[in-house]
Amino acid sequence: MRIKMVSLEDGTISCGFRKIAAFTARINPDTESYYITTKRYASLRNVLFGSHGIGVVDADAIDEIAQGLKDADLIGFSSMTGYADITRRVIHRVRELRPDVLMVWGGIHPIIEPENAITADVDAICTGEGEFAFEQFLSLAKEGRDYTKVENFWFKRGEDVIRNGFLPLMTTAQMESLPFPQYGEKEKIYREGKGFEPMAFADYVVHGGQDYSTLWSIGCPFRCSYCGNTKFIENDPNYTKIRHPSARYIVDEVKSVRQRFPHISHVSFHDDSFMAIPYKQLEEFAELWHEEVRVPFTVYGVIPNYVRRDKIEILTWAGMNRIRMGVQSGSEAILEFYQRPTPPEKIREATEIIAEFTPKYHVAPSYDIIMDNPVETRQDVIDTLELVYAMPRPYTLIIFSLKVIPNTGLAKEMLKRGIDLEQIDASYLQIPPRMANILLYLLGTWCPPRWLFDQLLKRVEASTTPQPLYPRIGLLFRFLFFGKKVINHLKFMDFSLMPGWISYYAYRIGLIDFWQRRVIKRMPRPEPPKRAFSPDVAPVIATDAVRH
């Protein structure tokens, strides 16, 4: 059976898609992967001016995409809610060209909004973890047998919808058995006016630079109402448990990628809750990474409640050079509204621990802040600004304008309150130039004296209060803010946030290699772990380095 797997998003990171694509290629060798990118972050102008939003794909491009997909026997689509409309249009056009082709829609959107996704011109949607459910579905489809009882799927039969339940979540052993995520194997990318072409080395550089993005763990112990994970937890409460393959598995995955792409000299872990992984597993990971990989890595998705000095220390010793932690708000009332059990005092405690390692060992940490919540009062906004002002420096901020994901707890609560929700396809990085938001850009760049900060606070209002906008001042402070962020990274020769040729040429001329082999070795590092005093640590389980 000829299968085409299709990812639609901003770029080509697609961590989850790469996993299911690799698994599908294992069970069905005649499988190819296709990437349709909106390129909304490809422009420096978009970043500086905040003019993001979902990329526009016109009718001619939709037709060209569909023409390139139509000759498959089965097409599997993957997209988030922000790209649901584009996905739906592609599916519809493929159906016009090939009424008999089997089409399945997976990814985040069908899980969060299955009732919406099933109305597309598809035969099925995947509503849970896809790997082993898809294997069952594909086996039955190839044999011409009834597949409509396969769990983790909904199926359409004429006007009827068959809504099946869920398989148990993958076990650690099952995760260990999966092939490594697909990267550089039978992948194609859409180029406007040319259709799909094999991904060239330049595509990996343009979209990723010298960084490789991956996931080690799945799951999140929190039920934050704004997050799509709440739907995963609603479907199976066990999603609050952190699951992951062995440390050997993730280290060998990265080694496998670096063997084929030697320019990869930084790794980003996009786990939802990396720091919630038990210390013993982190220690095992750290020793393997320090011994066998020896390149810097960044940990995203850090939750304040799980920040511990010993975990930060062991990961820093291994090579962690940056942390990104979710703060979201400094208002206890708003954190409770988000159902996020991270009180401001816990946030302050976490930032103080992280500050012990910055800038001695780390690039300035990034802290996520959510603004423009219509429920916030003026005092809630001030509480957030006060918390950010008091956090130990250096740090940088990642500022989001609240966008509500449909069918989440937050969406339901907002609707109860009669709040008119903005469309999800408005980017959460489009930050209105209100005084509160401008102050965040200022705080991410410079710590003003207290008297000046107090004066500026007097101009702050809740986002729903009519107030003047300052687009020119906002642009100035955005420019300074991003300039400071670039400087912070260049101090550590960290190009992980700079996809494109700049980071590649830094690798080619030997700058990154010189820095990592000569300079970092001489920089102070925490003491290595003393495994002799940790007899209860589980032994490393050896696995094959190549998983096809």
Model-derived features: positions:
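Hydrophobic/aromatic residues located in beta-strands of well-ordered beta-sheets
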Residues: 3, 33, 103, 150, ...
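Structural recognition of alpha->loop->beta junctions
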Residues: 116-135, 317-322, 387-399
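Short N-terminal binding/cap micro-motifs at the start of the first secondary-structure element
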Residues: 12-19
